[in-house]
């Protein structure tokens, strides 16, 4: 059986796959690069192998355009964006990157969640930013008045990352958080009350996005979060209005849709990949959720 699936790429794997083989590129610091990286788009994008195929990555990233246009996906949704717009992608989310126009300018940045693990920051601080969540809108367009301030922050981050800099992780943390807080002002967000149920629900969503091929029951995810299945279900229900099983089914359905549209796996292989050993069970599940069989869905645009 073929093992084709949407891969989770390490940073080195991503660079090998997405840059031209003739293009030699090395980060300024391999150690820092695993936690944080930033570069201007110009001078780099012409060496990338667009379109980039479906993949996941182990870090969060964003692209900020000051000119030009780009087309990038998050899950099954495709987004076209241009100047003064950020595109944010959380770690382990499925993505493709269709194009970056030749006149595109701006910044690419990635950062690992671990960079925010320190005693003076509250746990799960990234949960405050809807655009960095699995189900959030990845696009944030900023007003012209804020553009100069945001570019100054990005320039500070670029300077801290330069080969000659004796980098300071605290400086990098503060600047990233400053940028995220500024961007948050322009993000379309629902007002959500911070509570334990919300935090557990968000942790559950993040685990689903990362381990959907490995874990197939609510009980397994509850164990990973060190809570009982009943408590997990209550938290998810309170935070989202849906049961933990419903969110699990939604994630399985998303994976199935992506695999049907963007890989050459057979229906039987996809059924096996997402934990449905009986293909007829997968077909019934898929049709109950979409109104179409997997084969019918694959044929539609």
Indicate residue ranges for each PLM-predicted region:
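Terminal helix-turn-helix DNA-binding modules in bacterial transcription factors
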Residues: 238-283, 296-301
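A hydrophobic/aromatic-rich effector-binding and dimerization subdomain
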Residues: 2-9, 22-25, 98-159
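Histidine-centered metal-chelating micro-motifs
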Residues: 87, 91-97, 116
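Short hydrophobic/aromatic patch on the recognition helix
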Residues: 84, 232, 281-282, 286
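Short acidic-glycine-tyrosine-enriched beta hairpin
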Residues: 76-88
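An amphipathic alpha-helical interaction segment
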Residues: 145-191, 199
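Basic, amphipathic alpha-helical hairpins
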Residues: 158-165, 182-190, 204-217, 235-240, ...
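Generic protein-terminus/edge-of-domain signal
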Residues: 1-70, 79
């Amino acid at each position: 059986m073929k093992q084709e699936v949407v891969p989770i790429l390490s940073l080195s794997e991503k660079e090998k796959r997405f840059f031209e083989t003739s293009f030699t590129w090395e980060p300024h610091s391999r150690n820092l690069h695993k936690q944080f990286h930033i570069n201007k788009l110009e001078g780099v994008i012409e060496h990338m192998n667009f379109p980039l195929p479906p993949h996941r990555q182990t870090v969060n990233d964003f692209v900020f355009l000051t000119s030009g246009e780009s087309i990038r996906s998050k899950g099954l949704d495709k987004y076209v964006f241009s100047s003064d717009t950020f595109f944010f992608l959380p770690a382990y989310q499925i993505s493709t990157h269709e194009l970056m126009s030749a006149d595109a300018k701006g910044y690419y940045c990635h950062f690992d969640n671990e960079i925010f693990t320190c005693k003076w920051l509250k746990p799960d601080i990234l949960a405050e930013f809807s655009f960095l969540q699995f189900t959030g809108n990845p696009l944030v367009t900023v007003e012209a008045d804020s553009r100069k301030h945001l570019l100054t922050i990005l320039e500070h981050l670029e300077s801290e990352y330069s080969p000659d800099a004796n980098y300071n992780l605290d400086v990098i943390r503060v600047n990233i958080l400053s940028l995220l807080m500024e961007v948050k002002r322009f993000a379309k967000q629902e007002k959500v009350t911070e509570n334990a149920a919300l935090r557990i629900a968000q942790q559950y969503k993040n685990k689903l996005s990362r381990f959907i091929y490995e874990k197939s029951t609510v009980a397994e995810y509850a164990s990973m979060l060190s809570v009982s299945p009943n408590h997990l279900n209550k938290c998810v229900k309170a935070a989202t209005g849906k049961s933990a099983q419903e969110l699990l089914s939604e994630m399985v359905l998303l994976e199935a849709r992506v695999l049907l549209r963007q890989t050459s796996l057979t229906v039987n292989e996809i059924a096996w990949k997402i934990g449905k050993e009986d293909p007829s069970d997968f077909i019934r599940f898929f049709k109950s959720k979409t109104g179409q069989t997997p084969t019918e869905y694959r044929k539609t645009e």
